[in-house]
Amino acid sequence: MKMTLKKKGQEGHVNHSLGSRIFEAVNLLLLILLGITTMYPFWDCLVVSMSSLKSYLSTSIHLWPSEWSFEGYAYMLGNESLWTSYANSIFITVAGTLINMLITIMAAYVLSKQELKGHRILMFLAVFTMMFTGGIIPTYIVIKDLGLMNSLWSMILPSAINTYNLIILRNFFADLPTELEEAALLDGCTEVGVLFRIMLPISKPAVTTIALFYAVDHWNDFFSAIMYINSREKWPLQLFLRSMLFESDAAYSSGGESLFLLGQPMKMAAVMLAIIPIMCAYPFFQKYFTKGILTGAVKG
């Protein structure tokens, strides 16, 4: 089919009215303002973390460091407990995400089969857990009875599957062509082979999106650590940084420690160190993220 572009004055040319151009300009302006509003807190955190305490105290709006200083990063990176906490968080994130994905993928694939007897009941039970939970105290008792107290596994196993992620992936699997599975089965492939050799490769956007959700949840989790982790050497990064912020505030109240430790630049350096790993990973998964979440949420 041959397509031709219509020049101005020719029949079929789309002429934008003045009202349409005004709307586009206002819309663009609002989007720019929204972007600035969203990015400024992060930019402020970054600028303060690279500023000296004197520079921070001299102004209330921080657009650029007037006096550069990396003492906050030097202090945090020189703390051996930071690296121990980093290692704990990396283990929790990697191991937790692998377990999450294995269980979620298998459960979503099975529940996507309409011919499965009782699949509606199973889906109802899964959705039921989104509205009603066991509560903090019963969950704590279960973790204690299982012998998981003061163990990194207490931050992994209780959250082995997320119902919201299960539903997204289940909807994605349900909309895939059944002919692919039937052809693979006729060629002698097993159900497990169909899942891991056929379905997963073509479900990369949805699977990558779910993996990113799980990884971010594990990386940012500190409530579970507060509940179940007692030893300081087993603290994840988030709990360690939280402790550093509280210790800085306590030092300020008591008048102890050096003036630097009481400053906001050290706190902002701690915050930046916590979000840098996720910032570095997100650009590599961004192209899958939007496609996966929209497709998985709409399909099925």
Which residues are covered by each model-predicted region?
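A hydrophobic, multi-pass inner-membrane permease signature
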Residues: 2-300
